[in-house]
Amino acid sequence: MKKIIALAMLVLFVSAPVFAQKYASINAKRANIRTCAGTKCALKWHAWRYTPVIMVKTNEDKSWVLIKDFEGYSGWIRADLLSPKGGMSAKVDLNVRKDPSASADIVCTVAKGYPFKYLAKKGKWIQVSDEPEKAKDGVCKGWVYNAKLWGFFKQ
């Protein structure tokens, strides 16, 4: 009996960090992700609106947040550029479809890592929309099979 309790406690403590993860999404058209907490730190990459991230930790005054994306890349971002609203990223290059069906017409095709805003869910399909960098590019709005997306949404 003691072994069972000890094993249960071990599982609880080992898995606790998984339950404690906090998610956010980028809330700026384009955000700079840096090597450390500060505008003088080197730029690592850019993240786009709706990109979902895991918040790892903050600096002392909570003005910067260390984030990690779906591929495990990490960097620092100003806290005011994050939102608790959901976002999704394409886990692979994928087709966005007119209706929630693999046989539906393709509306647009996006590359791995492309960020989306969550709109709705129907079965195992997620309705998404983007915010193109240039208005002339048009909005990509449609349905994606949920296994091809990484992220979170608030219902």
Residue ranges of each PLM-predicted region?
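Sec-dependent N-terminal signal peptides
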Residues: 4-14
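Sec/Tat signal peptide C-region and signal peptidase I cleavage site
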Residues: 16-20
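Boundary regions of SH3-family modules and the immediately adjacent low-complexity/disordered segments
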Residues: 21-32, 37-38, 42-48, 52-60, ...
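Short, charged beta-turn/beta-strand-edge "cap" motif at the junction between a beta-strand
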Residues: 57-62, 121-124
